C-alpha cells in the first residue's frame, strides 16, 4: 500500500522509554492518520491509531488499522520515520 508520511517525532523519557507520533496518509483514503508509538526498549512497539484532525470514514480507519497489523513493512516504515526524527 502506498503511503506518505507528513510528519514524525520521537522522544525518550527519563526512564529511556520511547514515545513517538507519525502523521501519514494512505493511498485511496480521504483522511490523514496519526499513530502514537510506545516502546520500553525500542524493539517491541505498542501503538494507537487515530484520525489526525477531524474524524473520517470509519471503514477506512478500520482498514488502516488492519493494514498496520498485517503489513510489517508499513509499520516498520512508520517506526523508522519516528526514530529518524530523533537523530536530526
Please report, for each region that a protein language model flagged, where it lies by residue.
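Acidic, low-complexity intrinsically disordered segments
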Residues: 36-88
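Short beta-strand segments
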Residues: 4, 31-35
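Negatively charged, low-complexity tracts enriched in Asp/Glu with abundant Ser/Thr
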Residues: 1-25
Amino acid at each position: 500500500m502506498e503511503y506518505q508520511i507528513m510528519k514524525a517525532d520521537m522522544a525518550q523519557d527519563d526512564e529511556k522509554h520511547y514515545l513517538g507520533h507519525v502523521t501519514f496518509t494512505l493511498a485511496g483514503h480521504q483522511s490523514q492518520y496519526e499513530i502514537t508509538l510506545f516502546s520500553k526498549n525500542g524493539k517491541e512497539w505498542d501503538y494507537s491509531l487515530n484520525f489526525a484532525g477531524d474524524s473520517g470514514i470509519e471503514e477506512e480507519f478500520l482498514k488502516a488499522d488492519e493494514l498496520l497489523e498485517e503489513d510489517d513493512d508499513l509499520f516498520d516504515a512508520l517506526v523508522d520515520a519516528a526514530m529518524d526524527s530523533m537523530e536530526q
